[in-house]
A protein has these predicted regions:
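Beta-propeller domains
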Residues: 1-468
Length: 468
């Protein structure tokens, strides 16, 4: 794996005007926000896992046919503590932070004691989500940080959500210490309050509980990164990749990162929980299959009395192991890549990840989805458009380039599902080739423009487009 993934990124706090080739559609006005890890060492200390790096927020702003780029590190509590100490002092997924060497034995003992049940980081590296009119950096932790989508400034601390046609946001979390027992919690955040006074109240203060689902295994909550939603149902996959709570409570004392507290049981089952969006009631029928690992689902919809749920799955959890930095530094040709499990479309010799759709079709029957094709040996990354009807795909690639998650933006008044553009941030292995924002015609997957920026751009994970 190339060093461009795990080298320290740099901020570009002021907007940089991009050099254009091709023509940006005149209707494309707004900002593409991106999020991902961008700082992998602080002082003399370094992180162990790619998902540990400090969050770096990026934006590409489209205005009157021009494109402007800027980036800033998320000023989370974790970032502030680490930079103030000039070392890693907050534990992350794959990196355990220890007491300062200068502390005496009593201070160290107290630190171990208070970390028995760890207060997790607020380093939100995964995504950008919208609650009402507010935008937040988020990840698989209990805290989120609000950001200003224009300046990228961090407003303050307050995972893959869904939005319905009314603009409401749906998300889920866990309540491990609930009085009625540990459970998964699904909630809704209304879009905009109707009253003048209510409209100034942050959307998160109006959160509505939809339902709670008890853990299948009391001391082993399932890992989840996304869930599905149709017109009438929410679908949650309780998979066999689980967090060992007992091991977690002793992890700090034993010197184990919480990433090592995840365990996969190939002999376990995978449960599908189907919840009525209106009533919050969980379907009485139990749906289950063999064990697998899932990070992203593509889409879900209802057809002929059935719920169709399209997933990207793996036979084990080795995908996470692949992103330990010691593994990323290995030669790509010798790396034992994760095997892909079930796939919707045959013919792929590489993994397909970071799927996206025309969000107008979220929860509805759809035809196309877009994703990143990852092939570690040789390292040729591509983005692809998949036709689920014909079971064919078309792709874009360029030598020495790594495109990020493709984001679909629909044309104004679009009728066809694929009438719009695809946006992808692209970095290169070649230091002489500047990073650029790629704009593709979503129908043909042909390049119509690129916006090259003469500054450092880092690889990211997820994001969204804000129309203006």
């Amino acid at each position: 794996m190339e060093a461009i993934f795990y080298r320290n990124g740099k901020e570009t706090p002021e907007p940089v005007k991009a050099e254009l080739s091709g023509t940006i559609p005149s209707w494309l006005q707004g900002t593409l926000l991106r999020n991902g890890p961008g700082l992998f060492s602080i002082g003399e200390s370094s992180y162990n896992h790619w998902f540990d790096g400090m969050a770096l927020i990026h934006s590409f702003t489209f205005k009157d046919g021009e494109v402007y780029y800027r980036s800033k590190f998320l000023r989370s509590g974790t970032y502030k503590k680490n930079t103030a100490a000039n070392r890693i002092v907050v534990t992350e997924f794959g990196t355990l932070a220890y007491p300062e060497p200068s502390k005496n034995i009593f201070s160290k003992a107290f630190t171990y004691l208070i970390n028995t049940i760890p207060d997790f980081t607020d380093n939100n590296i995964i995504n950008i989500i919208r609650y009402g009119e507010d935008y937040y950096a988020s990840s698989e932790i209990n805290y989120i940080n609000q950001i200003n989508p224009s300046s990228l400034d961090t407003i303050g601390r307050v995972t893959h959500p869904h939005y319905d046609d009314e603009g409401n946001t749906y998300n889920m979390g866990t309540a491990i210490m609930a009085l009625t027992g540990p459970k998964y919690v699904i909630f809704r955040v209304p879009s905009i309050a109707s009253g003048i006074f209510e409209s100034i109240i942050p959307a998160l203060r109006k959160v509505e509980h939809i339902c709670s689902i008890p853990f299948h295994s009391t001391l082993y909550p399932s890992y989840f990164h996304s869930f599905g939603m149709t017109e009438n149902y929410i679908i949650f996959v309780e998979q066999a990749l689980k967090l060992d709570i007992i091991r977690l409570t002793t992890a700090y004392i034993k010197g184990v990162s919480w990433g090592k507290c995840l365990k996969y049981d190939k002999d376990d089952i995978t449960l599908f929980h189907v919840i009525n969006r209106r009533t919050g009631k969980v379907a009485g029928t139990k749906f289950y299959t063999d064990a697998f690992v899932m990070f992203h689902h593509i889409n879900a919809y209802e057809e002929d009395g059935h719920v169709v749920f399209d997933l990207i799955t793996y036979e084990d959890n080795s995908l996470y192991d692949m992103f330990y930095l010691k593994n990323m530094r290995q030669d790509a040709e010798t790396f034992d890549k994760s095997k892909v499990g079930c796939t919707l479309v045959s013919g792929f010799s590489a993994g397909l990840e970071l799927p996206g759709i025309n969000y107008k079709y979220n929860g509805k029957k759809y035809r196309y989805f877009y994703g990143t094709k990852i092939k570690w040996s040789p390292p040729k990354n591509k983005i692809a458009k998949v036709d689920t009807i014909t079971r064919t795909h078309i792709e874009w690639m360029e030598d020495e380039c790594y495109p990020s998650e493709p984001v679909f933006v629909a044309s104004p008044g679009a009728v066809d599902e694929d009438d719009g553009v695809i946006l992808s941030s692209v970095i290169s292995l070649n230091p002489k080739k500047t990073p650029f924002l790629l704009v593709l015609d979503a129908k043909t997957f042909k390049e119509i423009a690129r916006a090259s920026v003469n500054t450092t751009v880092h690889m990211d994970l997820h994001g969204l487009f804000i129309h203006q």
